[in-house]
A protein has these predicted regions:
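Bacterial N-terminal signal peptides that target proteins for export
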Residues: 1-5
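N-terminal signal peptide c-region/cleavage motif recognized by signal peptidases
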Residues: 14-16
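N-terminal secretory-pathway/extracellular module detecting exported/lumenal segments
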Residues: 20-163
Length: 163
């Protein structure tokens, strides 16, 4: 009887956060802060063009924010990822402006905080170009993941451009 009451009490008190599966294989977790973590799933990555230097993919993502209150859907995002061992980049439109982010996986002039804040870009790039596991690993060991895939990027720090 007490076992049944304990199970019932647990079931009735379970929050939406407990009911969700935070270990879903298709999710890639990016930046985590005090209010939770950014996550995404790849809905589409369509090859647009391949050259000697790399491959351009048109991407569509489903984005989320996970916290103690549960996982909130943040909608879909479209963009482009240029998979290149020498010029890795991400492009997207935000508020009517085109934004480009050039990755510097071996940055020598970038603070640890800056690298941490760019975790979403790193996760997205490596997940599209090398698979979800590489994206997940890049959040915690960007240089190691880039090195394991033969990257040789000369940028001393990551760069963002808006037009």
């Amino acid at each position: 009887m007490t076992r049944t009451l304990a199970a019932l009490a647990l079931a009735l008190s379970a929050s939406p956060a407990l009911a969700q599966d935070y270990n879903r294989q298709e999710l890639v977790r990016g930046l985590c802060q005090k209010d939770g973590c950014d996550e995404f799933t790849i809905l589409a990555a369509d090859r647009v063009k391949t050259t000697e230097e790399g491959t351009l993919f048109k991407t569509r993502l489903s984005t989320f924010h996970a916290s103690h209150a549960g996982r909130q859907d943040r909608g879909e995002e479209n963009g482009y990822v240029y998979c290149s061992p020498t010029r890795p980049a991400i492009m997207a439109e935000q508020n009517g402006q085109t934004m480009a982010f050039f990755l510097a996986p071996f940055a020598t002039q970038e603070s640890r905080e800056s690298v941490r804040k760019n975790a979403n870009f790193h996760a997205l790039y490596f997940a599209i170009c090398h698979g979800r596991e590489a994206g997940k690993a890049a959040v915690h060991n960007l240089a190691g993941v880039a090195q394991s895939h033969g990257y040789r990027v000369a940028l001393a720090q990551s760069t963002s451009l808006c037009r």
